[in-house]
């Protein structure tokens, strides 16, 4: 059974919320305390890689159009590369804070893919509105990991990066395929 698009979006939202809460928890208690147990340091990269695998599964089932297939494949590949780099950083294989440029690039490319794959205008439907909102959000929030690469000690960059995934989850949870844009004020009128 292939889930409906909104159910796949809700699953992605749950995973994005998990990733965001992991990053917020690490931000609150500090990296030293959070990573005292080795397994906790691997949670974020593992969740990102798991999201990549799920995106590849969705790519297989997104037979709506070639554009949807390519967009999901780009998101899956961006998540896989970002997760792999984060895993290498956690394991000590990579050391430079400049590797934070990879998640910045992944967020930017994902945002552009969101914008390109939505063929309808902002106010066509709730789904179109959310795709545009998520796309522009991802393009803008790519500045957080970029700032983290340039100034790794500033907390604002880590906080922004963590809250990016929480906001992404909120937007994805709002997705309903056949819903009007703003509650009862849709194409059917008030």
Residue spans for each PLM region:
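Juxtamembrane "helix-exit" motif on the non-cytosolic side of transmembrane helices
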Residues: 55-64, 114-123, 175-179
């Amino acid at each position: 059974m292939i889930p409906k698009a909104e159910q796949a979006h809700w699953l992605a939202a749950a995973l994005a919320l998990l990733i965001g809460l992991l990053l917020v928890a690490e931000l609150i208690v500090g990296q030293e305390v959070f990573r005292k147990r080795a397994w906790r340091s691997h949670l974020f990269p593992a969740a990102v890689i798991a999201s990549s695998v799920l995106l590849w599964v969705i790519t297989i089932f997104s037979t709506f159009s070639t554009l949807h297939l390519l967009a999901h494949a780009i998101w899956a590949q961006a998540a896989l590369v970002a997760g792999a780099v984060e895993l290498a950083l956690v394991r000590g294989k990579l050391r430079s804070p400049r590797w934070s440029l990879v998640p910045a690039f992944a967020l930017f490319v994902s945002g552009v893919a969101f914008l390109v794959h939505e063929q309808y205008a902002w106010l066509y439907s709730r789904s179109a509105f959310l795709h545009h909102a998520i796309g522009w959000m991802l393009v803008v929030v790519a500045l957080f990991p970029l700032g983290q690469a340039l100034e790794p000690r500033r907390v604002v960059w880590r906080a922004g990066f963590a809250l990016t995934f929480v906001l992404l989850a909120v937007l994805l949870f709002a997705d309903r395929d056949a819903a009007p844009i703003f509650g009862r004020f849709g194409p059917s009128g008030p």
